[in-house]
UniProtKB/Swiss-Prot annotation:
Alphabetical list of InterPro entries matching this protein: Rbsml_uL18_euk (IPR005485), Ribosomal_uL18_C_euk (IPR025607)
GO CC list: cytosolic large ribosomal subunit; nucleus
Entry's localization field: Cytoplasm; Nucleus
Source domain of life: Eukaryota
Biased amino acid composition, Basic and acidic residues: 245-264
One matching Pfam family: Ribosomal_L5e
Protein name: Large ribosomal subunit protein uL18
Organism whose genome encodes this protein: Dunaliella salina (Green alga)
Alphabetized UniProt keyword annotations: Cytoplasm, Nucleus, Ribonucleoprotein, Ribosomal protein, RNA-binding, rRNA-binding
Length: 271
């Protein structure tokens, strides 16, 4: 038998340092988080805001967050499950829906800070890269950083669709057009990006499947069939959703009903 070096010795275990809980669970990249959270030493009591974008199987979440010693504070949040209130009932996790959620959280935070009329953003997205310009006599635009978490930042990722929606909504986010869908050969194809914002890629696939595999189309696009959404009407549908989001980004909350009086049951004494 060959020589086997003993690695995990008593000194190894005595010096072993347990990693943070969320690192052990594989939920947080603390190296990236430190660079997103740490503020300059000469900016006293100034928050560093982040646009947090997360994806699940059925939902897209966008939040405006800043960190404190006690924990993170969420200033505004938007979810794709809210989009049916604005007229979008299908495809709540695709590229176009991620754009809508980013637009919604941007308009929501600017409305909360009374900046919605000052910074309206790109009201009619044309696929061009948009950067908000500060007004001369007024407050600066709301500045935040994109927090992608553990999501891989590949070109064309839905993370950047949410960021594009927030940019067009009027937020100031440092970015590069290289990560938007349609970027190839060192230039951005604005027509491709505009097509994805308005769901054109879904409409194309819908038309192809209707012609080639009608039976599979009924199953794959069952929610579209149920809501009577045809490929020709998808672009107009998304335009209406964008307009409704800008019109009322903060719908009134439902009033909570008064809870019923708690009944107390005391055991009966048995003789």
């Amino acid at each position: 038998m060959g020589y086997v070096k003993v690695v995990k010795t008593s000194p190894y275990f005595s010096r072993y340092q347990v990693k943070y809980r969320r690192r052990r669970q594989g939920k947080t990249d603390y190296r990236a988080r430190l660079r997103l959270v740490r503020q300059d030493k000469n900016k006293y009591n100034t928050h560093k805001y982040r646009l947090v974008v997360r994806f699940s199987n059925k939902n897209v979440t966008c939040q405006i967050v800043y960190s404190t010693i006690q924990g993170d504070v969420v200033m505004a949040a938007a979810y794709s499950k809210e989009l049916p209130n604005y007229g979008l009932k299908v495809g709540l996790t695709n590229y176009s829906a991620a754009y809508c959620v980013g637009l919604l959280v941007a308009r929501r935070i600017l409305t909360k800070l009374n900046l919605a009329d000052t910074y309206k953003g790109q009201e009619e997205p044309d696929g061009e890269d948009y950067n908000v310009e500060p007004v001369e006599d007024g407050p600066k635009p709301f500045y935040c950083l994109l927090d992608t978490g553990l999501k891989r930042t590949s070109t064309g990722s839905k993370v950047f669709a949410a960021m594009k929606g927030a940019l067009d909504g009027g937020l100031d986010i440092p970015h590069n057009e290289k990560r938007f869908v349609g970027y190839a050969d060192k230039k951005l194809d604005t027509e491709v990006l505009q097509k994805y914002i308005y769901g054109g890629h879904v409409a194309e696939y819908q038309e192809t499947m209707q012609e080639e595999e009608p039976e599979k189309y009924q199953a794959h696009f069952s929610s579209y069939v149920e809501n009577e959404i045809e490929p020709d009407g998808i672009e107009d549908m998304y335009k209406e959703v964008h307009a409704k989001i800008r019109e009322n980004p903060c719908p009134p909350k439902k009033e909570r009903t008064k809870p019923a009086d708690a009944k107390r049951w005391s055991p009966q004494a048995h003789l």
